[in-house]
A protein has these predicted regions:
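Composition-driven detection of intrinsically disordered, low-complexity segments
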Residues: 8-10, 74
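Bacterial N-terminal signal peptides that target proteins for export
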Residues: 1-8
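Hydrophobic h-region of N-terminal signal peptides that target proteins for export
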Residues: 11-20
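N-terminal alpha-helical modules
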Residues: 19-129
C-alpha cells in the first residue's frame, strides 16, 4: 500500500516539475538565470562524483583514506572560496547565480584534475596511480 502511495505521489509531482523547467538558453529573469546556474552546478557535481568514484576504485587500500581526506578538504576550500568570491553580491538577487557559477567552475576544474590521474603517462612520478 505504501509503495502505491509513493508511486502516485511521484506521478503527480513529475508533471509539475516538468512544467517548472526553465529554458536555460532563453532565461530572461534573474530567478531563471539562477536556476540554470544551479542546474549547471548539479551537472558538474554529478560528473565530479562519477570521476571520484572511478578514481577511488583504482586506488590502493593505503591511498583511499588519503584521497577521501583530500577530497573533503577540497570541498571545504571550494565552498569557502566561493563564499568569499561572491561576498560582494551578498543579499542581492544575483548572489545565488554567482555562487553557482563559482561552484561550477571549481568543480569542473577538480573533475579535470581527477580525470588526469586516471590517464597518467607511464613513468609519471607525479601521478598517484
Amino acid at each position: 500500500m505504501r509503495k502505491k502511495k509513493i508511486i502516485l505521489a511521484t506521478l503527480l509531482i513529475l508533471p509539475l516539475s516538468q512544467a517548472l523547467a526553465v529554458d536555460c538558453k532563453n532565461a530572461a529573469t534573474q530567478q531563471d538565470m539562477s536556476q540554470c546556474a544551479n542546474l549547471n552546478y548539479k551537472k558538474a557535481d554529478a560528473e565530479l562524483n562519477r570521476t571520484y568514484k572511478d578514481l577511488l576504485a583504482k586506488t590502493t587500500v593505503a591511498q583511499r583514506p588519503l584521497l577521501k581526506s583530500a577530497q573533503l578538504t577540497w570541498i571545504k576550500y571550494r565552498d569557502a572560496d566561493c563564499t568569499f568570491q561572491s561576498s560582494a553580491t551578498e543579499g542581492g538577487s544575483v548572489h545565488p547565480m554567482i555562487i553557482s557559477a563559482c561552484l561550477t567552475h571549481k568543480t569542473e576544474e577538480r573533475t579535470t584534475q581527477l580525470k588526469s590521474f586516471l590517464n597518467c603517462s607511464e613513468g609519471d612520478l607525479s601521478c598517484p596511480l
